Amino acid sequence: MFSWIRLLGALLLLASVAHAQFQFFEHMFGGGGGGGGHQGRQQAAQNVPSDSSRYQSQWDSAHCDKYLCPGTLACVHFPHHCPCPHPDVEEKVELGEGSAVCVSKGGYKEGEAARKIELARKGLL
């Protein structure tokens, strides 16, 4: 009798471990075959449409009597005064002739991206 209880306990333990293992893979990989359908629909509902109507409505409602920056919708005096859209990861480099570009910091030290751009403009990089 005791061996049947041990055998039943071992089977229940193996079944629960197998069930937990499959739940891990289902959660990790989005449900695989049939279980991930609901999650896929939920993910698709969060995606932003690829039309420009939302941006266009923000552009139209912005009030600016100077220059409206296209990337950030900031109102500035001159186009090269526009801020970078992602200042945490981008550095603004003014090119000197009234224009500026935003470049990835890429883990460089402060001002290193500007130095590399200047070297490239001179043909040294």
From Swiss-Prot:
Described function: Probable component of the endoplasmic reticulum-associated degradation (ERAD) pathway.
Amino acid composition bias (Polar residues), ranges on this chain: 40-54
Family designation: Belongs to the LCL2 family.
Domain of life: Eukaryota
Cleaved signal peptide residues: 1-20
Protein name (record): Long chronological lifespan protein 2
Alphabetical list of InterPro entries matching this protein: LCL2
Key words of the record: Signal
Residue span of region Disordered: 35-54
One Gene Ontology biological process: ERAD pathway
PANTHER family, per database record: LONG CHRONOLOGICAL LIFESPAN PROTEIN 2
